[in-house]
């Protein structure tokens, strides 16, 4: 059970947009000078809306989310967004929002840059872990609960990234080409619910283009949909460095350019207004939106920093633990191997001894750490655990910049183009393979956002040594050893991660060359030397003797992160480690980390159990150990479908690896990703294509069983109430997530076989029965009509399915929907 809310904030009214606040804002705008307006629509010192003291406008501070308040200090690290969705528990996610709001107030933060509400389209997207899964209804309900919680504490939430940001590949230059119906039925609803149900304060646009127009300057997104269709009253901000055309941004683009006025510079805006290119009313409108949002939260009337809230808030920690408990999905439990309440445990694997999380702006350094190895040994002192120490380093002894090995370091050549063409414009020696931004040694012609580089060093080991060479680079990278290409991610145009294991022989000289280019965005490159993950002799004996071997593997912040699409497969060294353990034991439980689907077919038949732990936050180790030992019954269910093969995913043929990249600037300066699967993505697509996923949407095992009975469907005005009984027929307490799907039995347009339209998480003691009621309104039966450019409901027969997962229907019934008067 959650502890009571630690702090009850005083003096903070429920945030609201009102005519009074709009009028106050208009009065302030009327007093602003043109220069002040031009400056106000650009960020200040990277993380602020600037203050205008003479008008009583405060500085407004932002911080990254959404897994915690990322503020250059330690903070509570919550489970990732996809883990939050896996709880299917809106009450709990509301508590998460409250806790995040308190964390923000404890640090004086006004705007939390979260949640992320993009839809999971493919397992490859590097930021899936931040989002709420593949279903728009589930994502919308989780997002709204999160936002309402955050904003109840006097902190603005910022729902992101609007819209169709479903890949990190080439995110500055890729156009998500999505048809109108698919946008409104799949990719818009979570944002719509954030606006209409949660009254979110701010919306952040995405880096990508939507149908050939950058989101940050799209009139369709920022005005036609957000404001005219949904009635949004708040402010729209850009993602960091995602504004491209000054005049387009100034007219129909975002209200606020972050992190600073790089595109909409004050000088340019003032010039545009004075020469008649831009009407001043456009700036008035942007300032109006920003100021009325500030007034809605009373930021001008109270301090945001609340010193009565500790940064290490016990309530926040308890919420993080409860979410982790509810998020973990048990995918496999052969012969009821789990729970193992007594016996000889051995805990191992690359992720056993560390807090595992995704990378990028969602990365948070936790205040408290509970790893799996720590938690398992604290539960039972007899538990043996091996923590694989981090032996990674960015430089090794004996690196030389020349073949004669007289100059220590790495030879670096920089080019003022992205193709390593012509002569390098800068040459220098570095102590390692590393770039961040524009190097101090770079020639003035080098632009960090458009360059290429070659890094060369020579190495003669004194003894045989094996290194796992890992390269992170933006946008493309590749490397050679003695002239032979060893790995490449060239031409992908996003942050890349490549890795190769190589045996270096004593006395042999090796030439290592790393090449890289950056076509846009943040420039970065790093070569890491790591050691292979191996089972040593001591571990082997413990593995053989153990009744239960817990192997912790998966992705982390190096392989799954912002600005980088990941692989469907696990890191190679993790797979090799698991195989070495499986050669020694038949009693293996795999704890998986990741933000989505992972290839499992090569090892799944050989393990006893699999727990999908996602990125479980700072208390993840505790929750995992409690489930393994039976103190908690697993209750999470998949907010995604997990495919057996990547090729099975409905978007596979239309994701980047199968779409030609067009890069002729005079014709098309960006890539086009056509969402040809349309509305048939996720479980909708698997069912239409008659493809069985490895694990279906809504699936998750428990230590107990549940029985569904007595379905009733009653009409209540314009709503229908679907009610039924759920009984815990097992011997332990547990929670079941009942799911209600709706099928349109006959429609004038092609619709999915069924769609999720309601759910409830029900906690039951052994033998206990509860009556569950779920209401279905117009939203449950509608589809987007392209002729009307609006949603419509066709009268007729609908099938109601009550299910334990999308593939496990327990009860069905029928209802008739009559014509609905608009």
What is each model feature region?
Residues 1-8:
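Bacterial N-terminal signal peptides
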Residues 8-468, 472-786, 792-806, 821:
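Glycoside hydrolase catalytic-domain context in secreted enzymes
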Residues 808-822:
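Short beta-strand elements
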């Amino acid at each position: 059970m959650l502890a009571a809310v630690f702090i009850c904030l005083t003096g903070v009214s429920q945030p609201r947009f009102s005519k009074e606040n709009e009028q106050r804002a208009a009065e302030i705008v009327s007093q602003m000078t043109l220069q002040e307006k031009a400056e106000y629509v650009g960020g200040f010192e990277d993380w602020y809306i600037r203050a205008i003291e003479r008008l009583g406008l405060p500085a407004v501070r932002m911080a990254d989310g959404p897994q915690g308040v990322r503020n250059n200090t330690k903070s509570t690290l919550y489970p990732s967004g996809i883990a939050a969705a896996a709880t299917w528990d809106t009450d709990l996610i509301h508590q998460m929002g409250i806790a995040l709001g308190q964390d923000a107030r404890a640090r004086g933060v006004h705007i939390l840059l979260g949640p992320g509400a993009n839809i999971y389209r493919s397992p490859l997207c590097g930021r899936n872990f931040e989002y709420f899964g593949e279903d728009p209804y589930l994502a919308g309900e989780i997002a709204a609960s999160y936002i309402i919680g955050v904003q109840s504490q006097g902190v603005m939430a910022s729902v992101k990234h609007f819209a169709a940001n479903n890949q990190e590949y080439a995110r500055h230059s890729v156009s998500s080409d999505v048809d109108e119906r698919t946008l409104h039925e799949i990719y818009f609803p979570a944002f719509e619910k954030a606006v209409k149900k949660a009254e979110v304060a701010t919306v952040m646009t995405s880096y990508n283009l939507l149908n050939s127009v950058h989101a940050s300057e799209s009139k369709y997104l920022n005005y036609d949909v957000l404001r005219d269709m949904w009635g949004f009253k708040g402010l729209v901000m850009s993602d960091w460095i995602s504004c491209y055309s000054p005049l387009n941004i100034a007219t129909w683009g975002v209200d606020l350019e972050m992190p600073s006025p790089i595109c909409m510079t004050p000088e340019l805006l003032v010039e545009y207004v004075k020469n008649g290119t831009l009407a001043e009313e456009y700036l008035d409108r942007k300032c109006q939106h920003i100021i009325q949002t500030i007034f809605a939260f009373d930021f001008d009337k109270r301090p945001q920093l609340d010193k009565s809230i500790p940064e290490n808030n016990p309530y926040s920690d308890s919420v993080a633990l409860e979410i982790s408990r509810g998020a973990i999905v048990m995918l496999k439990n052969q012969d009821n191997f789990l729970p193992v309440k007594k016996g000889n445990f051995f805990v191992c694997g690359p992720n056993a001894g560390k807090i595992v999380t995704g990378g990028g702006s969602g990365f948070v350094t936790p205040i408290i750490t509970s790893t799996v190895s720590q938690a398992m040994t604290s539960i039972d002192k007899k538990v043996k655990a091996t923590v694989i120490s981090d032996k990674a380093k960015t430089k090794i002894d004996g690196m030389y910049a020349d073949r004669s090995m007289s100059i220590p370091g790495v030879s670096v050549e920089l080019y003022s183009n992205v193709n390593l063409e012509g002569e390098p414009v800068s040459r220098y020696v570095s102590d390692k393979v590393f770039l961040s931004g524009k190097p101090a040694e770079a020639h003035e012609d080098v632009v960090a956002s458009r360059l290429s580089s070659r890094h060369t060093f020579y190495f003669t080991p004194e003894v045989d040594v094996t290194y796992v060479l890992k390269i992170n680079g933006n946008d493309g990278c590749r490397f050679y050893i003695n002239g032979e290409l060893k790995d490449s991610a060239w031409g992908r145009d996003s942050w890349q991660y490549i890795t190769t294991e190589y045996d270096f022989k004593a006395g042999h000289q090796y030439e290592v060359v790393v090449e890289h280019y950056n076509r846009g965005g943040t420039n970065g490159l790093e070569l890491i030397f790591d050691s292979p993950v191996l089972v040593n002799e001591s571990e082997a004996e413990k593995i053989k003797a153990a009744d239960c071997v817990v192997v912790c593997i998966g992705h982390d912040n190096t392989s799954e992160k912002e600005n980088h699409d990941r692989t469907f497969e696990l890191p190679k060294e993790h797979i090799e480690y698991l195989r070495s353990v499986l050669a020694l034991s038949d009693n293996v439980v795999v704890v998986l980390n990741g933000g989505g689907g992972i290839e499992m077919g090569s090892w799944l038949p050989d393990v006893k159990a699999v727990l999908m732990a996602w990125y479980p936050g700072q208390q993840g180790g505790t929750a995992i150990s409690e489930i393994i030992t039976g103190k908690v019954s697993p209750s999470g269910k998949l907010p995604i479908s997990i495919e057996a093969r990547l090729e099975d995913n409905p978007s596979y043929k239309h994701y980047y690896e199968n779409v030609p990249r067009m890069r002729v600037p005079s014709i098309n300066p960006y890539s086009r990703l056509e969402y040809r699967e349309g509305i048939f993505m996720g479980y909708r697509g698997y069912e239409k294509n008659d493809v069985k996923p490895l694990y279906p949407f809504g699936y998750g095992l428990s230590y107990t069983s549940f029985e569904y009975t007595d379905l009733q469907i009653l009409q209540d005005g314009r709503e229908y109430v679907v009610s039924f009984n759920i009984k815990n027929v097992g011997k332990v307490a547990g929670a079941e997530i009942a799911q209600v799907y709706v099928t349109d039995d006959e429609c004038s347009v092609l619709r999915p076989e069924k769609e999720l339209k309601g759910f409830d998480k029900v906690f039951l003691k052994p033998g206990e029965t509860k009556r569950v009621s779920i209401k279905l309104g117009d939203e449950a039966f509608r589809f987007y009509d392209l002729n009307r450019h609006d949603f419509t409901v066709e009268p007729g027969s609908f099938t109601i399915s009550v299910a334990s997962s999308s593939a496990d229907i327990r009860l069905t019934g029928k209802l008739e929907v009559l014509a609905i008067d608009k």
